[in-house]
């Protein structure tokens, strides 16, 4: 039976544990030593030891964001202003979502070159569906249908990769070209606008990107998230300790809660500063909870479910995963479906951001394909499969957004900005290769 692919989604727990422990580069390969620590001091020592061994996690990208922010603030005193910081996050949202979409493919050791045009398709579909002179669908129906159709694109591409054994590069490159043509055909050379003053459905879509909570609601949302999140994390870790399972020290759990709370307070405080030169613009953008929900949802899926363990196992060692009874075609197909679904979410926000959708906007979506891969890799996701988190996509998207934003403030031409982003990508790719090489056991 080991020589035959098993389509059953059910596999024994023990073989999967052995599999992931043996898979080189799999994110869930071993229990990190710091998780076995009994105190905060032991945790920090084990964490530093892991960094010295070459497994630095998100530390490089966090340090990179800090360095970039300081450098641009010194070069241009406006970079860290509340107005620019909120603008920076809004500009980075598309990069973040597309990077999270790409991560599903990269974790499986594949690549999806179509996510940018799936985003374009999502933008065209949702804009066309809500037009009063067209289908005139309610905004929520338009969004659901858009996400379903985008997911169908992933289903087709994933099936071709998983069932027909076609290279994902070829399949998704073909998908990119087909989707570009489909978007242009659907638009028919016309402009599709999304206003914010007359038609209710258009206003809702418009507000997804440009809408903001009031300052009071922003603080209430933060309080709900902090109390709910902190309570869940504390309860989860406490339950694991009482059950004799691996869990971080209570002091570390408390420290994480305090750090997350402080970060949330800073974000809401910055957003509640008046950012308008004339009039008033305050409040938390709707975009922040949208990205947060997507990131947390996909993190839970990848880190806390059997499906997520299977994804990491396949990316780390496909043959061992197959022998453990994992259905490779099914998991790979679902990986591409989720990538396209996430790109569809980005497409809805892209339509809101652009306000009007034209063929030129769709052609511009091509550049987001490579930026999605760049954001995922810069954030810390491996190009070789089996290692990465959705958080890496958010951080990588923030890095790319910071570079574009900072260099734009300095008046650097667009072509040179692309050169800088490419150099950062090459550096991240080099680090990925070297870290993998260092992690391989010596003969």
Model-found features: residue ranges?
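Alpha-helical transmembrane segments within multi-pass membrane transporters and channels
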Residues: 134-177, 395-396, 400
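Transmembrane alpha-helical segments in multi-pass inner-membrane proteins
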Residues: 110, 336-347, 351-421
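Single transmembrane alpha-helix segments in multi-pass membrane proteins
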Residues: 70-133, 159-169, 184, 320, ...
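Inter-helical junctions in multi-pass inner-membrane proteins, predominant
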Residues: 77-87, 184, 188, 271-288, ...
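Membrane-interfacial amphipathic/re-entrant helices at transmembrane-helix boundaries
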Residues: 9, 33-98, 133-141, 280-281
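Transmembrane helix-bundle core of multi-pass membrane transporters
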Residues: 179-302, 440-443
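Short cytoplasmic-facing helical segments at TM-TM junctions of multi-pass membrane proteins
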Residues: 307-332
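Cytosolic-side transmembrane-helix boundaries in multi-pass membrane proteins
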Residues: 2-64, 68, 191, 228-264, ...
